Amino acid sequence: MKTQQIAQQLILGSSSIYRRDLLQRLQIPFDVSNPDIDETPLPGETPDATAVRLAAAKTRAVAATHPGALIIGADQVAVFEGIQLGKPLNHLNATRQLQLIRGKEVSFYTALCLFNSAQDTTRARLVPSRVKFRLLSDRQIENYLDKEQPYHCAASSKLEGLGIALIEHMEGEDPTALIGLPLIALVEMLTLEGVEIV
């Protein structure tokens, strides 16, 4: 398999192995850098604005040590009935989140940002998805949490893994957005930056 060569260094600003795996699908060379940013929502900030701001902040954090690179940043926020569902961080919070959203619809906002640090230009896109969760029993929730431990996933939903079994149906323009990196939008952005994928 031959990988495409690109003129600028391409960097994925993420610690997520799932975003890295998604980007590898495009068969282009890239490096990974973990952006160390505060992901706390700002007071009064809407969930979609939070996602866009954090995706952009990740690219800027990486750009500080990688001048001249094309930097990809992404962030995802889940919302249920106007409430932002963050990363649960532990078993108890994950149980509560999944009990709250079982049988219900949750909106996921996945923001994508491509920062050209050589030209100081940014391209950004917000890709919304709606997910209807199955009406899960407490036993099913417990089984899922024991097997997957999705404590660092928005809404306790590790959709790139066993979390797919929690879904009754989903609506959205890009299925990869739910995993955290909307590849359809990314291909368009990279093409505009002169990176040929195919």
Curated annotation (Swiss-Prot):
- Cofactor needs: a divalent metal cation
Q: Which UniProt keywords apply?
A: Cytoplasm, Hydrolase, Nucleotide metabolism
- The leader peptide range reads none
Q: Which residues form the active site?
A: 75 (proton acceptor)
**UniProt catalytic activity:** N(7)-methyl-GTP + H2O = N(7)-methyl-GMP + diphosphate + H(+)
The answer on whether this UniProt entry bears the keyword Ribonucleoprotein reads: no
Q: Enumerate the Pfam families for this protein.
A: Maf
A GO biological-process term: nucleotide metabolic process
| Alphabetized PANTHER family for the sequence | BIFUNCTIONAL DTTP/UTP PYROPHOSPHATASE/METHYLTRANSFERASE PROTEIN-RELATED, BIFUNCTIONAL DTTP_UTP PYROPHOSPHATASE_METHYLTRANSFERASE PROTEIN-RELATED
Q: Give the family this protein belongs to, as stated in its UniProt record.
A: Belongs to the Maf family. YceF subfamily.
Entry protein name: 7-methyl-GTP pyrophosphatase
